[in-house]
């Protein structure tokens, strides 16, 4: 699997749909997807890879596949966009949350849906993002992409 295309991800009914390049056949890119669930480990499709079992030659097509499957089979239907405050930095996915005036985050590296976030609370979203960016900037990156 190539890196997860977090910068292309979309949020849909309590899931984050994350496309990635599955393969290339005759110069044609084939996309698949992985999911994160707002319910985390309680969600049936948390960290699932392409539960629909279909692929597409476009990112929009793979979103259609994922959304159709989630609409038919998901156990999570959330009107709240749990993934609203998501950012990519150096191809890492950062999701910032607020609860009772405190901020915390989830951090996923470019090739894995294992949360590597430090257990730390912040006074503001900006403090949280600055701390994460400073930590990531300490290490050289083979690929640079900053959208924080």
Regions found by a protein language model. Name each.
Residues 14-15, 59, 129, 145:
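Low-complexity, intrinsically disordered short peptide segments enriched in small/polar/basic residues
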Residues 118-144:
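Mixed-charge, glycine-accented linear interaction segment located at domain edges/termini
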Residues 86-88, 135, 146:
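Boundary-flanking segments of nucleic-acid-binding domains in nuclear regulatory proteins
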Residues 40-61, 110-127:
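A short, exposed loop/beta-hairpin motif centered on an aromatic-Gly-Thr core
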Residues 1, 143-148:
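Short intrinsically disordered terminal tails
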Residues 55-77:
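Short, structured interface segments
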Residues 26-48, 95-115:
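Short aromatic-glycine-(Arg/Gly/Cys) micro-motifs in beta-strand/loop hairpins
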Residues 2-32, 72-102:
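Short N-terminal "domain-start" leader segments
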């Amino acid at each position: 699997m190539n890196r997860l295309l977090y910068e292309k991800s979309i949020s849909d009914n309590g899931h984050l749909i994350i496309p990635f390049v599955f393969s290339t056949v005759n110069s044609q890119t084939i996309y698949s997807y992985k999911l994160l669930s707002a319910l985390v480990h309680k969600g049936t499709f948390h960290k699932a890879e392409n539960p629909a079992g279909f692929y597409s030659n476009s990112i929009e097509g793979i979103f259609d596949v994922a959304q159709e499957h989630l609409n038919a089979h998901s156990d999570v239907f959330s009107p709240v966009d749990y993934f609203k405050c998501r950012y990519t930095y150096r191809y890492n996915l950062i999701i910032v949350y607020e609860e009772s005036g405190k901020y915390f985050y989830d951090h996923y590296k470019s090739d894995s849906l294992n949360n590597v976030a430090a257990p730390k609370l912040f006074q503001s979203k900006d403090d949280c993002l600055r701390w994460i960016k400073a930590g990531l900037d300490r290490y050289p990156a083979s690929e640079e992409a900053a959208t924080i």
